[in-house]
Amino acid sequence: MASTKEIRSKIKSVQNTRKITKAMEMVAASKMRRAQERMRNARPYAEKIREIVANLSKANPEFRPAYMEAREVKKVGTILVTTDKGLCGGLNTNVLRFITNQVRDLQEKNIEIVYTAIGSKGLQFLNRSKAKLISQTIQIGDTPHMDVLIGAIIAQLEAFERGEIDAVYLAYNRFVNAMKQEPVLEKLLPLEPAALVPEDKAGNSWDYIYEPDAESILNGLLKRYVEAMIYQAVTENMASEQSARMVSMKAASDNAKNVIGELQLEYNKTRQAAITKELSEIVGGAAAV
């Protein structure tokens, strides 16, 4: 049985660990609220671009932009969004499982995959898997900026424009609520015209005055729309990261509290046994006298 001194040392160690996890839980909760706000602020921009692109496409059906051109799929690109840091439960594992399943399904069809990694954890996974990378960006911080992401994103978009890849997918964790995040694998390119039109506005039809012309504006907006979708995915993944970390740290704090309780009980039993032994020795000594 451990001595009372050893048990006190263990209790002190677990208490210090609990202070750390409790502080990390509070920091993650604060960061999660800010990440949720950024996520909500990014949505109206993407929605408005989608609405304008849908109206332009309906008003000018003769245009067939490169981003909406479907072709036989022989090679695909996947943009993988993960976190830069750990301690967020199974968040990264869940989205990486999607990637593993995608690789298996596409390899069965002899389709090649090239990747863009956003986040250190995804980059490490792809390097271990010896996957083909065409671009990457890591250490994007708690506040994502498009100027940091754009270089990696453009590599995939330009590869699609040149016909080097035939489809682009986006893998990330969608934020549902503080307790739930779900991994998703979405098809980004080619864009489906029907997917651009919100159901509540499917019957509306608008047209605009174009300068210089409708085709160049449509091409430019489609590119901005795809970039906005990727930025939205990054903000959702960040909100998911902070909420998962908050939950993980809360679980760690609760477990530490339980361990402290068990150690305290063991300490009391050990101390009581020592006192009982001393009393027995005293009583035995007195009887001998």
From Swiss-Prot:
What compartments host this protein? Cell inner membrane
Q: What organism is this sequence from? A: Polynucleobacter asymbioticus (strain DSM 18221 / CIP 109841 / QLW-P1DMWA-1) (Polynucleobacter necessarius subsp. asymbioticus)
Per the record, the GO terms for biological process are: proton motive force-driven plasma membrane ATP synthesis
HAMAP family noted in UniProt: ATP_synth_gamma_bact
Q: Which cysteines are joined by disulfide bonds?
A: none
Q: Which GO terms describe its cellular component?
A: plasma membrane; proton-transporting ATP synthase complex
The record describes its membrane topology as: Peripheral membrane protein
Task: Enumerate the UniProt keywords alphabetically.
Answer: ATP synthesis, Cell inner membrane, Cell membrane, CF(1), Hydrogen ion transport, Ion transport, Membrane, Transport
- Matches recorded under Pfam families: ATP-synt
Q: What does this protein do?
A: Produces ATP from ADP in the presence of a proton gradient across the membrane. The gamma chain is believed to be important in regulating ATPase activity and the flow of protons through the CF(0) complex.
GO MF terms, alphabetically ordered: ATP binding; proton-transporting ATP synthase activity, rotational mechanism
Recorded protein name is: ATP synthase gamma chain
Q: Secretion signal: which residues? A: none
- What interactions and quaternary structure are annotated? F-type ATPases have 2 components, CF(1) - the catalytic core - and CF(0) - the membrane proton channel. CF(1) has five subunits: alpha(3), beta(3), gamma(1), delta(1), epsilon(1). CF(0) has three main subunits: a, b and c.
Per the record, the similarity remark reads: Belongs to the ATPase gamma chain family.
Q: Which domain of life is it from?
A: Bacteria
Q: Which SUPFAM superfamilies match?
A: ATP synthase (F1-ATPase), gamma subunit
- UniProt cross-references to InterPro entries, sorted A to Z: ATP_synth_F1_ATPase_gsu (IPR035968), ATP_synth_F1_gsu (IPR000131), ATP_synth_F1_gsu_CS (IPR023632)
